Amino acid sequence: MNLSGKTVLLLAPKFFGYELEIKKELENLGARVIYFDERPKNDFFTKVFIRLNLKSFISKKIDDYYKNIIQEIKDESIDFLFLIAPETVSIETIKQIKSIHKNIKIISYFWDSIKNKKTALEYLNISDKYFSFDSNDIKIDKKIQFLPLFYI
């Protein structure tokens, strides 16, 4: 795939450097990549609240974090929003990004089974492409495509 001249907004959790390897590979394909951690913070409590879907306890922190991101990217010309294992970014935030970047294509990838991610299916309808590493997930909806894990 040639991404020459394209800009990718990458929202992915910091996870053993995978996000940096993915960013580097997108750049090797020619893309300009703007990366932000999908989580507003990586401390223990933030991770617990997100993982247990108790985001209401940190909703102000999440809202402020994404307002800052939207402010930072508003003047960019973004072609793709690449969401990896999204848990924190709200559908409303994605809609705001899409309203600014009208032609943006949204790609979601889950490297954990959908059954383990309570909010995973929320991203299905807003995504142009939706991938899971779990071959069982493709049975949930015809829009879900199988994409095995990568290795570094």
Listing of model-derived features with the role each one plays in the protein:
Residues 96-152:
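Catalytic core of nucleotide-activated saccharide and alditol-phosphate transferases
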